[in-house]
């Protein structure tokens, strides 16, 4: 299965502002959270967990958030790839898993999902 990557969304602050507008979450709250979680670095990775990206989403939280809210923000093609396994964990088959998880490094996707 081929999944189209979403192009880079521009500056981090601009992405957070757009996410604030689209989700209704306070811009300053999202900015402070991004500063605290990643020092505004969209490529941040935690050394001791799967937490990654601007808002340091761990894998399961990211997958669940994209599954629940992705479609209403233009990420439906990714949300459709996510399913809940028999053990209750969120899963994505094959190489599409990395594509979905790598959205955590896209400032727009991460900011929008953080707003949810």
Model-predicted segments: where are they?
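Alpha-helical segment that forms one wall of the substrate-binding/catalytic cleft
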Residues: 63-116
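Peptidoglycan cell-wall recognition and remodeling modules
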Residues: 42-54
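An amphipathic alpha-helix signature
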Residues: 13, 59, 63-66
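Structural recognition of the beta-strand scaffold that forms the well-ordered cores
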Residues: 32, 53-56
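Surface-exposed patches in mature extracellular/periplasmic domains of secreted proteins
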Residues: 28-32, 43-46, 73-79
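Secretory-pathway/luminal and periplasmic proteins that interact with or process carbohydrate-rich
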Residues: 38-45, 64
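Export/targeting segments at the very N-terminus of extracytoplasmic proteins
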Residues: 1-40, 104-116
